[in-house]
């Protein structure tokens, strides 16, 4: 199973989701069955490391942070089993790269997997303060945990 997390620039939300999910996958012993990556719908930050503020926030919670920003491309539809958008704008931008709708069934909103929060989108913390980064991590921990539970059931069946 291959998962792709997607936000705008691939320096805050989607790399956070990728690194949180990787930690949860490792903890569940599913590293051989689930592979994660992340991308951005824009090319603003291609090649950059994750945002320093997000990296610091993740490390404070014990996460290992790795990865470099890359852009989402139409080839990703065939490469990944599930593509998880952080917000509605990115969801629509992803779908726009598949005009025939062949892969629309693979694209979901990450917040569809949250249970503890009412948020329908993961807000972009880039221009906000520290509390915004913490809220994003809280949302993603919840969503990734529930997603992993769902995938674990699929992988067993």
Swiss-Prot record:
Q: Name one Pfam family in it.
A: LMWPc
Going by the UniProt record, its keywords in alphabetical order are:
Hydrolase, Protein phosphatase
Q: What is its EC number?
A: 3.1.3.48
According to UniProt, the reaction catalysed is: O-phospho-L-tyrosyl-[protein] + H2O = L-tyrosyl-[protein] + phosphate
Q: Which cysteines are joined by disulfide bonds?
A: none
Q: Which InterPro entries match?
A: LMW-PTP (IPR052995), Ptyr_pPase (IPR023485), Ptyr_pPase_sf (IPR036196), Tyr_phospatase_low_mol_wt (IPR017867)
What are the catalytic residues?
7, 13, 124
Q: Which SMART domains match?
A: LMWPc
Record bears the keyword Hydrolase? yes
Q: Which residues form a coiled coil?
A: none
By sequence similarity, the record places it as follows: Belongs to the low molecular weight phosphotyrosine protein phosphatase family.
This protein is called Putative low molecular weight protein-tyrosine-phosphatase slr0328
Species per Swiss-Prot/TrEMBL record: Synechocystis sp. (strain ATCC 27184 / PCC 6803 / Kazusa)
Read off the lineage from the record. Bacteria, Bacillati, Cyanobacteriota, Cyanophyceae, Synechococcales
């Amino acid at each position: 199973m291959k998962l792709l997390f997607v936000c705008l620039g691939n320096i805050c939300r989607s790399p956070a989701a990728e690194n949180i999910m990787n930690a949860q996958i490792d903890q569940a012993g599913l590293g051989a069955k689930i592979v994660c990556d992340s991308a951005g719908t824009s090319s603003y930050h291609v090649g950059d490391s994750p945002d320093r503020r997000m990296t610091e926030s993740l490390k404070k919670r014990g996460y290992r942070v790795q990865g470099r920003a890359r852009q989402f491309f139409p080839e990703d539809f065939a490469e990944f089993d599930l593509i998880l958008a952080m917000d509605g704008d990115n969801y629509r931008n992803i779908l726009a790269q598949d005009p025939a709708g062949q892969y629309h069934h693979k694209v979901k909103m990450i917040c569809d997997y949250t249970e503890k929060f009412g948020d329908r989108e993961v807000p972009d913390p880039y221009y906000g303060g520290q509390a915004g980064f913490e809220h994003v991590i809280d949302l993603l921990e919840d969503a990734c945990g529930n997603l992993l539970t769902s995938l674990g059931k699929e992988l067993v069946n």
